[in-house]
Amino acid sequence: MEGDQRSGPPAQSLLPDGHLVLWTLCSVLLPVFITLWCSLQRSRRQLHRRDIFRKSKHCWRDTDLFSHPTYCCVCAQHILQGAFCDCCGLRVDEGCLKKVDKRFPCKEIMLKNDKAADAMPHHWIRGNVPLCSYCVFCRQQCGSQPKLCDYRCIWCQKTVHDECMRGSLRSEKCDFGEFRNLIIPPSYLTSINQMRKDKNTNYEGLASKFGKQWTPLIILANSRSGTNMGEGLLGEFKILLNPVQVFDVTKTPPIKALQLCTLLPYYSVRVLVCGGDGTVGWVLDAIDEMKIKGQEKYIPEVAVLPLGTGNDLSNTLGWGTGYAGEIPVAQVLRNVMEADGIKLDRWKVQVTNKGYYNLRKPKEFTMNNYFSVGPDALMALNFHAHREKAPSLFSSRILNKAVYLFYGTKDCLVQECKDLNKKIELELDGERVELPNLEGIIVLNIGYWGGGCRLWEGMGDETYPLARHDDGLLEIVGVYGSFHCAQIQVKLANPFRIGQAHTVRLTLKCSMMPMQVDGEPWAQGPCTVTITHKTHALMLYFSGEQSDDDISSPSDHEDVKEAE
């Protein structure tokens, strides 16, 4: 009897534990409900903030976390999240957004008519002064107390302690600080507006009071370049300059933005392009359109702040291969002020298809960097095709280089561009050139190619003709394949230097071949490619980051190896 009772399990253990199931469901579903509720509340807050942003005179951007200790300019409380103005730098929490416009005006791009144009006072805002800033009165550090304290002028960026702020400072005329020679003062635009009403377009006399050192700067930034780094740069430049000088080229095309040059003195304007080589080419095309319109006197000089990958043109001009925030924006402006003007050759690439009895219009491109046919164009074409399908996957430099490595390795095995010399005829200045067994031909205008490789120079152990980007000459080289390209990039091999020429003509006799102009690839059938000089572009060269390119005076070229 006792054995039978022990062998049978309890009836209760056969049933599922209802409490355990209930607690399991709660532990799984409760975080889901909390996440959904928080997401809904956040969406509602964002809609509410956007409505306020749209009606406000400030240029607000919201953030979930400020990068350094921040205090609300309205209630003076410490805040972790909220909104900040891209133009004047005000920082507020969500609850104080509606009160800001009444108490704190934003930067005025133009003065009101009743203000004296020659006596613009400082525009002070309190709190959140930059780190390592010093009082203009006592020369001691500002912003060192853990509270909303001290003042900053949103035009000249000077800072002053609360206790040092006096009536004389409040009414003192603002001199626009360190970057006065780059800023377009609101008083100037007010005077221009009045002159245009009077149908007077002689702006030279108006600009003379700012001196010969006044070289106003226009910022043209691509907000989509460099994993959207351009968007943050727009705000930083608006704080240091007049917001009217800063443009997002994805919203305002360069040809429209550059019309601001026509309101400024002749031959005085500088432009800083924040983006990749493609954005620079876009801006240079817009400048060419200004020449067609007869606006040669207003043509600006162009500097580059490189974003993204590649950037061979900016590297050639001394601006580096890519900006990742390693130096402050203020230092970028100092570099622009120190830069020297040079010229850059621009070339017309005309592609005429065969077999259409000249009925199809030739395709035309403008080349700043290089043209190529062969393995490097094939890698660019494959990369471009995959990036168009999934752009979000190609935002990392390391990943992009890995993809290029994959396609380069694949081409080493497949050799899709072999026997190029049998498919192409090459003419330099009208003379046909016999080619060895090559897989690619590259036509260079600048010193750098392929993301930082000095292709014409190679390993540097051979004599080679002088190469410049302002002499009206192109350098033409050949490569034996993808593996040869890789060897050249790590300085283990020299390219096959074909020669230099003023005019290059390539005839593709048969089959499809990959081609590219300045990184824009396509697949091309039988055709004739003619490259001729188009124009010069006025660029700015920064000597602080030496690129070893031959762009200085002739005396500096004596040490360069020349062909015998």
Swiss-Prot record:
Start and end residues of each DAGKc domain: 212-353
Superkingdom as given in the UniProt entry: Eukaryota
Record pathway: Lipid metabolism; glycerolipid metabolism
GO biological process annotation, one example: diacylglycerol metabolic process
Locations listed in the record: Membrane; Cytoplasm
Disruption phenotype: Homozygous knockout mice are normal, reproduce and behave normally. No gross or histological abnormalities in major organs, including the brain are observed. The phosphatidylinositol 4,5- bisphosphate-signaling pathway in cerebral cortex and long-term potentiation are affected.
Catalytic activity field: a 1,2-diacyl-sn-glycerol + ATP = a 1,2-diacyl-sn-glycero-3-phosphate + ADP + H(+); 1-hexadecanoyl-2-(5Z,8Z,11Z,14Z-eicosatetraenoyl)-sn-glycerol + ATP = 1-hexadecanoyl-2-(5Z,8Z,11Z,14Z-eicosatetraenoyl)-sn-glycero-3-phosphate + ADP + H(+); 1-octadecanoyl-2-(5Z,8Z,11Z,14Z-eicosatetraenoyl)-sn-glycerol + ATP = 1-octadecanoyl-2-(5Z,8Z,11Z,14Z-eicosatetraenoyl)-sn-glycero-3-phosphate + ADP + H(+); 1-eicosanoyl-2-(5Z,8Z,11Z,14Z)-eicosatetraenoyl-sn-glycerol + ATP = 1-eicosanoyl-2-(5Z,8Z,11Z,14Z)-eicosatetraenoyl-sn-glycero-3-phosphate + ADP + H(+)
Pfam family, one: DAGK_cat
Zinc finger region(s), Phorbol-ester/DAG-type: 57-106, 121-174
InterPro entries found in the cross-reference section: ATP-NAD_kinase_N (IPR017438), C1-like_sf (IPR046349), DGK (IPR037607), Diacylglycerol_kin_accessory (IPR000756), Diacylglycerol_kinase_cat_dom (IPR001206), NAD/diacylglycerol_kinase_sf (IPR016064), PE/DAG-bd (IPR002219)
The keyword Repeat appears for this protein: yes
GO MF terms held by the record: ATP binding; ATP-dependent diacylglycerol kinase activity; zinc ion binding
Record keywords, A-Z: ATP-binding, Cytoplasm, Kinase, Lipid metabolism, Membrane, Metal-binding, Nucleotide-binding, Repeat, Transferase, Transmembrane, Transmembrane helix, Zinc, Zinc-finger
SMART domains per record: C1, DAGKa, DAGKc
Transmembrane region(s): 20-40
UniProt tissue specificity: Highly expressed in brain and heart. In brain, highly expressed in Purkinje cells of the cerebellum, pyramidal cells of the hippocampus, mitral cells of the olfactory bulb, and neurons of the substantia nigra. Lower expression in neurons of the thalamus, superior olive, and lateral reticular nucleus is also detected. Expressed in platelets.
KW Membrane (keyword) present: yes
One cellular component term from this protein's GO annotations in UniProt: cytoplasm
EC number(s) stated in the UniProt entry for this protein: 2.7.1.107
Membrane topology listed for this record: Single-pass membrane protein
Role summary: Membrane-bound diacylglycerol kinase that converts diacylglycerol/DAG into phosphatidic acid/phosphatidate/PA and regulates the respective levels of these two bioactive lipids. Thereby, acts as a central switch between the signaling pathways activated by these second messengers with different cellular targets and opposite effects in numerous biological processes. Also plays an important role in the biosynthesis of complex lipids.
Similarity remark: Belongs to the eukaryotic diacylglycerol kinase family.
The name this protein goes by in its record: Diacylglycerol kinase epsilon
Lineage of the species this protein comes from: Eukaryota, Metazoa, Chordata, Craniata, Vertebrata
